[in-house]
Amino acid sequence: MTPSKLSGLKPFSAFLLTTAMLTVALLAFQPAALGQQGKGASSDDWFIKSAKDRKEQLQQGIKGGEKRDIIPSVPGSPIPQTDRLKPPSPDFLLAKVKWGKAAIIGDELTQDWNLAPNDMLEFHKKARSKGFKYMPTQTAIQDFSFNPALMPSILLGGVRELNFSPEGINRLRKYVLDGGMIVCDSVYGSPWFYESAKKLFDDMFPESRFRKLPPDHPLFHMVVDIDTASYSCGGEKEGGKPFMEGLYIGSRIGVLVSKYGLGCGLAGEMDVFEKLEANGLKPMAYSEETARLIGENLAPYIIGYGRVGEAEGKAELFGKLDENAPTSEFIFAQVKHEGAWNAHPGAARQLLMQLEKDSAIPVSLKRVSIDLNRDDISAYPFLFFTGLDDFVLTHKQIDALRKHVNSGGTLVVNNALGLATFHQAVVREMRRAFPQSDLALLPHSHDIFRNLNSIKRVKYTPTLMKDKGEQLQGRPVLFGAKVGGRLCLLYSPYDLEGGWNEVRYPLSRGYQSASAKQLGCNVIMYAMEH
């Protein structure tokens, strides 16, 4: 409304209208601190570029057929291991995805995806110093191949809300299921980006959900041990520990989200946080030192667990609960629970094929997934339970497990990757379910080690050998508990299932393939005979 029109109003009305207009104008220029606890009024408040693009170039990457180091087997002690690449081999490891809107900041065009323009330059410099000859690159989502063999992982970084078209969402989902990895960096710790990323991928993968990575997760120990973390801003709630969240696809992280910004720390450009705080925002980011340590571990994790993704990404046909299998046919029934219950897709089928080959037992090669909260499990005397981290059984699940073992069934529990958090959860939850039955180490003379295969010595993974080789002395380790005088609960604290897949799981604490299959077949035989 123009001043001439204002003058035609009654004085009091004109006063009210002028006051209202001034109020709106003042609200528009409120500092971001008036947003929710430093969140800002909108994600646009976070849209500040951290530094200018240095536009440095690295030398050319590796070529198809060239030899290179793969990954260290144990933290701090790289084992030289070369592998001839199958041409064409990717020259790229982690591509920065172009997404979001553009704006002019100062005299420079800036976009959501590139607020920390030098992060991938420094990430790849560090990776190349460790022998990984990959090149930094960028890709628009519409130009992306969505082929993990050509691009093992992609980076989505930003501060504003992450969103994609339905077609893009479907293609990203398939990319992850096929073995690709998506890394989401909130750059400055923007809650707008962080919350939208978690929602986007939670909706994209309804069969899984984000979980906090446990302290002994391979990502924190691939090359360097990240037992503690420092933060340039925020992080008070983490107690000096790293905080990362992953959405598991099998045993690998399909989508990794960093609530605390990584990009500025990777690039060594931290001045932007003072600007954000001056605007009333509360940024959250790792220190330069911790961000670079995470980056140092991320490169070998992508490579090593990319190979896991290739193996576990193959389609698996599950049996159905209503299929009337012959009563003499062995059915591998696996328990679904709130944790990462499907840690090694395809592994059970590999074991069952071995069992079918080595014995006269009729075997169904389709495993069945069981929900203890609602499914009738009376037709399945063998239940398999595995996971990667913490879980809590419901009262219904506990009742179902008690009924199962009291009816003559057997429960076999496996610690996928051999992580401490899952072990602690198993001990706690089995004590809740069977308070009168304690897990005890089975003696090496037990029948379970000599029914189908005579097992006196086993081979463990390099990480477990480094940690406990002298203590284990090559002896198989199984714990068991009796209910009503019958051994019906078996627990492997070291990963048994991973060895069935014949794929290398970096930093896994478990059995190597041949030993895992022999022991797995013996466990099934014992369960069927008792």
Question: What label would you give each PLM region?
Answer:
Residues 1-13:
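N-terminal secretory signal peptides that target proteins for export/translocation
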Residues 15-28:
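Bacterial N-terminal signal peptides
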Residues 153-194, 298, 382-423:
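Short alpha-beta junction capping motif
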